[in-house]
């Protein structure tokens, strides 16, 4: 019998080892296949070329992490990292082979995030100041797409097209009635009269304070938009506001009359504009000048960025500035590649602190906040990092609440005028299923050694004593938050109280009240980090977290399977509302703080393109 078990165990481990070997060989084969399929030829750039900024490609801080299926099949959504876009445009301004830039809005306008687009806009203005022409052409310009197109020397539009200038709006969703119908009870605790993050679960509309701050914030971001567009188009803010109030969506001929565009035309005349700007155009009548499959010489931003990397001399020995991207909700534990896990980022920052080649760090925060515990774990690692090397905070579209908590550990804070930040406040949401149990005929009994033994249970609502305990915890976390902000920003208790209470600020307003040091984008923060570290002109940037390699994707999917959930296909008029509902529930699912206390933005805005 003993030999039987020994043989069985040996057979089991032998089989397991064989499976591991086969999987390894299979994974290696897939890697080699992927490399062969995805290999690209060395890029080539000819004279008289136009750089293309495609408004159909979203611009985000970092490229998304792909699934194995997306990596192998190449069906991933195309996304441009912000630094890729800005660096490519700025380098193209100095490259004699690039003679013009085309802002292409023919497909759709998917660009998003006013703060990120402000940095792209500044790069476009520098390109134009170099003496090179920018031409914009589109079918339908969204408000965000037009924000970039307005920088062009010439804006052209298809005769069937239009321009959207109708202002900013938000339509928050409230779950209170739905939760009540489902039998789910909600009890909330918060500190800060403006901390409205609990309102979707307790109210059926916005509180006066939350409505006031959202209205003020929208107005400020809108004024920044109007001022920028007015300056670029030689219009006035009152003119644009009148267009937004009275017309909103302008057909091509009306947009021309209102001087939002310069010409209503078709694609062939766009080619004529590019030719006038010096771009080589394929002429069918001149056989000697024809180039196969080319209307004109062009290169995309992604291709040009790859070309620059290929042509640039390797400087591996230069001191490094690390850019650490913190994007998404802040969650307890390691999290996923779509959010900011406190433990995972804590480890990453420790690794960077111990790397002697890294002389300075930029934390790029694009987060509405989340778990207070996770934010504090990251804050501590930033504090330790700052003690050894300069840490500059760069705020993206939003860096609020838990995102601002982390930012207080940096040496300097840089934000765009239209960044959403602040929201210094905390809250807790306590759900219970007592009514749901009644409806389903479920009953619970209780045995305990004391009145507070089952304080963590969600079976029934919290008692007054239990609520008092939770409120004490919320108050304590808020005091910790205030202390960090007060010490970091050198604010008196009175000044601190006036900027806290969960109130949200634009970057421009935040600078005025002392929450932000300097206005600018990611490159501003990088340059500041280099100056603080006294690196001179010779340094290089290294970005974190590094993308997952294909091997990691392969093993993960060999274990969990290659299947992906198919999304529901909905008509356009339902899709927006369904996506909003999905986002809200997905964000609620990330509420995993061990104490149930959160430092998070009190609303979730998504400015959608038509």
Swiss-Prot record:
UniProt keyword list: Cell inner membrane, Cell membrane, Hydrolase, Membrane, Protease, Serine protease, Transmembrane, Transmembrane helix
Pfam family, one: Peptidase_S49
Classification via InterPro entries: ClpP/crotonase-like_dom_sf (IPR029045), Pept_S49_pIV (IPR004634), Pept_S49_SppA (IPR004635), Peptidase_S49 (IPR002142), S49_SppA_67K_type_N (IPR047217), S49_SppA_C (IPR047272)
Compartments, record wording: Cell inner membrane
EC number from the UniProt entry: 3.4.21.-
Topological domains annotated Periplasmic: 38-610
Cytoplasmic side: 1-16
GO cellular component terms listed in the entry, alphabetical order: plasma membrane
Gene3D superfamilies per the UniProt record, alphabetical: 2-enoyl-CoA Hydratase, Chain A, domain 1, 6.20.330.10
Transmembrane segments annotated in the record for this chain: 17-37
GO biological process, one term: signal peptide processing
Molecular function, one GO term: serine-type peptidase activity
Top-rank taxon: Bacteria
Lipid bilayer topology: Single-pass membrane protein
Disulfide bonds listed in the record: none
Catalytic residues identified in the record: 195, 401
Enzyme class: hydrolase
Main location: membrane
Family stated for the protein in its record: Belongs to the peptidase S49 family.
Record function comment: Digests cleaved signal peptides in vitro, its in vivo function is unknown. This activity is necessary to maintain proper secretion of mature proteins across the membrane.
Assembly information from the UniProt record: Homotetramer.
Protein name (Swiss-Prot/TrEMBL): Protease 4
